[in-house]
Structures are given as structure tokens and as C-alpha cells.
């Protein structure tokens, strides 16, 4: 277990995986891994990190700011700026290890952290490769809603659809969120939105398949972790989280990304 700080002074906690067959003085390529959005390092990112370490990489699965074992108050907060910085802070940490090759540091983002990973790779030229797995751009999701039909098509995939929110709906959402800030401010901005994943027993035939799949992972022994936002039955993200994501889109300079990029998606992936 390791700790390091980002440039905002928040202490991040991660699990560092080093291949068993590393030789004295050897410098290996390294990968920082985060995700999914609302998950902790003991879930998907730790599995990815372990698998890549078995393939010869030094890997770091870490909890981003405000989540899991990492620092930051209030809890269950997210920020497109700070969370992009978290990836660069991980690159800082990896590059300071004497067994890591600074010219071979990459990052991997899962789910909503895929968008953050791409955003970090645009801004941080030390990132020599970037990969995403079933990525979302969470700024786009929170600003537009899902841009797909919620029900699967005959082939089991998801058809594109008009965004769920237009400018007027987005404005009304901001009105509601900002009015709620009075209560959140009184509570130290620690007020949480309702839990964002169903309990498996509440799934019905009308539940969209991807929501049922979330429940089957985050609320069962398969994927549950008590520190994960997505596993918390009492609440999910802080209520003010969407405000920055709606107003500060990431990937505005994605066309300037020069690092080799791998975007991995399932054939029927919801995102």
C-alpha cells in the first residue's frame, strides 16, 4: 500500500503491484489504473492492475480524491479538474520510483474514469500511452443524460437516441441543484444523493439490463465493497457533484491527443 499527494494537497492511497521477476536495477513500464466511476481500488481497478503486473508492468490501482481510502473532504465528491489531476499525480509517483522507466508510463481508465484518462493524457505529455475500458465522458452524461434508448434492441445492444436533456431541461436541473446548495452548505456539503444502484431484490422485468447488471455487481458478494459509492445502500454521490460536470466539459482538446490510445468496448456495451 502506498500514499502520494496530488498538486491540490490531497493524499491519495493506492496499491502498488510489482512483477515478481523484476531484476535488480531494472526499470519497467508502468500503468496507473482507476475506475469504475464510484468504485474503489479493491474492485475493478485492482483486478486490472494485478493482471497487467502479471504481464510485466509495474501497476498502481488507486482511489481518487474524496473516495475510498484517499483523502479529501467532503466525502463522495468528484471534480473533472481534480480527478484529471489525480492521474497526473499517479504519474508523478510512478516516475519517482527507481524501478520505473519514466519514458514508459501509461494510464488506464475504466467507465467514467476512461474520460478522465483521455483528458489527462491530452494535458500531461509524460503519459506515453492511454487506454480506456467501457468508457463514459461523465461531463457529457451529466449535461445531456444518456444518449441511448434505455432498452436493448433485438441484437442485445443499445440504439442511439436524442439526449435526455436539452438546454431548458439542463437549466431546470441546475436550478434544482443550486437551490439544494443551501441545505448542502449547512451540512458541510456532505449531503448525499439517493443510492444510485438498485438492490438486486428490487429488480423487475422492466428494469433496464445495464442497471440490473450494476446491481448484480455492486450489491452482491461478487463486487460489493463497503467503501465504494456504488455499493452504498444509504446514499451515493454528494448532491453538488453534477454542477461542475455539467458546466466544465472535459475532452475539449481531444483532437490534440498524441499518445497512443486504445479504447476497448464490448460489442453491446451500454456506454
What do these predicted regions represent?
Residues 25-36:
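Short beta-strand element of the alpha/beta-hydrolase
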Residues 119-219:
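Alpha/beta-hydrolase-fold enzymes
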Residues 77-98:
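Alpha/beta-hydrolase active-site loop
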Residues 1-26:
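N-terminal cap/lid segment of alpha/beta-hydrolase-fold proteins
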Residues 51-71:
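Conserved alpha/beta-hydrolase
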Residues 257, 263-265:
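Short beta-strand/loop motif that positions the catalytic acidic residue
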Residues 98-111:
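Alpha/beta-hydrolase fold nucleophile elbow
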Amino acid at each position: 500500500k502506498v500514499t502520494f499527494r496530488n498538486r491540490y494537497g490531497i493524499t491519495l492511497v493506492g496499491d502498488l503491484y510489482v512483477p515478481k521477476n523484476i531484476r535488480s536495477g531494472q526499470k519497467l513500464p508502468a500503468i496507473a489504473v482507476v475506475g469504475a466511476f464510484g468504485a474503489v481500488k479493491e474492485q475493478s481497478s485492482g483486478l486490472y492492475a494485478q493482471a497487467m503486473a502479471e504481464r510485466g508492468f509495474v501497476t498502481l490501482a488507486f482511489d481518487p480524491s474524496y473516495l475510498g481510502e484517499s483523502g479529501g473532504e467532503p466525502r463522495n465528491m468528484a471534480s473533472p479538474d481534480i480527478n484529471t489531476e489525480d492521474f497526473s499525480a499517479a504519474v508523478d509517483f510512478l516516475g519517482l520510483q527507481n524501478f520505473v522507466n519514466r519514458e514508459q508510463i501509461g494510464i488506464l481508465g475504466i467507465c467514467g474514469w476512461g474520460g478522465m484518462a483521455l483528458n489527462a493524457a491530452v494535458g500531461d505529455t509524460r503519459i506515453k500511452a492511454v487506454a480506456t475500458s467501457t468508457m463514459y465522458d461523465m461531463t457529457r452524461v451529466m449535461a445531456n443524460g444518456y444518449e441511448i434508448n434505455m432498452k436493448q434492441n433485438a441484437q442485445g445492444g443499445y440504439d442511439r437516441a436524442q439526449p435526455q436533456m436539452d438546454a431548458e431541461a439542463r437549466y431546470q436541473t441546475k436550478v434544482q441543484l443550486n437551490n439544494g446548495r443551501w441545505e448542502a452548505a449547512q451540512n458541510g456539503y456532505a449531503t448525499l444523493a439517493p443510492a444510485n444502484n438498485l438492490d438486486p431484490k428490487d429488480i423487475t422485468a422492466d428494469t433496464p439490463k445495464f442497471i440490473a447488471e450494476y446491481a448484480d455487481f455492486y450489491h452482491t458478494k461478487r463486487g460489493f465493497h463497503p467503501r465504494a459509492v456504488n455499493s452504498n445502500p444509504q446514499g451515493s454521490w454528494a448532491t453538488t457533484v453534477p454542477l461542475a460536470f455539467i458546466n466544465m466539459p472535459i475532452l475539449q482538446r481531444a483532437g490534440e491527443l498524441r499518445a497512443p490510445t486504445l479504447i476497448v468496448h464490448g460489442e453491446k456495451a451500454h456506454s
